[in-house]
């Protein structure tokens, strides 16, 4: 494989020295970029874009042409795994993702296959291989998956939810069915991420977008337990390099200590967690990624720079920080504001790495 020219991101995740704090943005390939909108229009719809390796590669690379980002992230969707299980994924205009056959009981769970990542999800692996080839070693490629709990919310609710009453009803009234589903998803996600690593992903991230809707006890049993199983089953070395793993639970700031015990290399922080506090609590165990409020990118450039400086000062000197937003970039953010953000991270972080 091509020699990696910029390994700042991988080094920071492993808490090794870097010259400046590395930065990338969740959803950096996305609708805030006019070139993304053009490519998506060419693809026809969102899943067609995900399933076309050349177009998925093109949108993955678009933000790297604009900004000096320190990592690329595979352009895909967290719902590829449930889609490959045959739930009939489709996108409703203005409604987001929906499934034609949601999971309602243990019998439904028993019928679900564990998808073969090189078969039903082969299009994702083709995209990973294509992107790795086209990156030419400029920056590392991040692979990802949704967490079992987060995938289960969509599969049981039949799509997006605000109150999560359907899955919580299953959790409290039929916990065996939900555990069976989460176990099957943990096995599927482990295979899926390992296949991404073999195809060329140099780091992986598990997005637990909806873990924060749970009580502490339920989070441990229904979300963290299954992410821990995945971390235990992941390939941690490939191509002679360690493959770092980041866990991100949105709304999970109160559980960082438990998350750090999973054996992951880094924790993603949303903007509601104070990064100085997070470093005091778990910085001796894991790297931290985050955590500017994505809405800050609506602010004037000087205010964006001020916020970057505040977060850098909060983390302080030393290694183990990957700068990011606290969640995905919003689709109506001015692209030049994202440029201000990336440039500010590199320029203002130098003093913390001398």
From Swiss-Prot:
Enzyme Commission (EC) number: 4.1.1.37
Cellular compartments annotated: Cytoplasm
Residues engaged in binding substrate: 27-31, 46, 77, 154, 209, 327
Pfam families xrefs: URO-D
Main subcellular location of this protein, as a coarse class: cytoplasm
Keywords: Cytoplasm, Decarboxylase, Lyase, Porphyrin biosynthesis
Family named by the database record: Belongs to the uroporphyrinogen decarboxylase family.
Subunit structure of this chain's protein: Homodimer.
Protein name: Uroporphyrinogen decarboxylase
């Amino acid at each position: 494989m091509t020699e990696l020219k910029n390994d700042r991101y991988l080094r920071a995740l492993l808490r090794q020295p870097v010259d400046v704090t590395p930065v990338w943005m969740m959803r950096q390939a996305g609708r805030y970029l006019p070139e993304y909108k053009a490519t998506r229009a060419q693809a026809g719809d969102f899943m067609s874009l995900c399933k076309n390796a050349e177009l998925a590669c093109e949108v993955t690379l678009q933000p790297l042409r604009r900004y000096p980002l320190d990592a690329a992230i595979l352009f895909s969707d967290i719902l590829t795994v449930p889609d490959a299980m045959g739930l009939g994924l489709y996108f409703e205009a203005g409604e987001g993702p929906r499934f034609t056959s949601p999971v309602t009981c243990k019998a439904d769970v028993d019928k679900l296959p564990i998808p073969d990542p090189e078969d039903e999800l082969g299009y994702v692996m083709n995209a990973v291989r294509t992107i790795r080839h086209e990156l030419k070693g400029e920056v590392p490629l991040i692979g990802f998956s949704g967490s079992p709990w987060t995938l289960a919310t969509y599969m049981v609710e039949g799509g997006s939810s605000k109150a999560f009453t359907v899955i919580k009803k299953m959790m409290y009234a039929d916990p065996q069915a939900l555990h069976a589903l989460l176990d099957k998803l943990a096995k599927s996600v482990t295979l899926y991420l390992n296949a991404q690593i073999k195809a060329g992903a140099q780091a992986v991230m598990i997005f637990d977008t909806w873990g924060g809707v749970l009580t502490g006890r339920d989070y441990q049993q229904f979300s963290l337990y299954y992410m821990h199983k995945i971390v235990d089953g992941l390939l941690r070395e490939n191509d002679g390099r360690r493959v770092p793993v980041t866990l991100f639970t949105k709304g999970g700031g109160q559980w960082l200590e438990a998350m750090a015990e999973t054996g992951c290399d880094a924790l993603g922080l949303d903007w509601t967690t104070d990064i100085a506090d997070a470093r005091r609590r778990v910085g001796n165990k894991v790297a931290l990624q985050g955590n500017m409020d994505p809405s800050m990118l609506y602010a004037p450039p000087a205010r964006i720079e001020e916020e970057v400086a505040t977060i850098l000062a909060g983390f302080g000197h030393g290694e183990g920080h990957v700068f990011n937003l606290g969640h995905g970039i919003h689709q109506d953010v001015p692209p030049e504001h994202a440029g201000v953000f990336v440039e500010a991270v590199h320029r203002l972080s130098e003093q913390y790495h001398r």
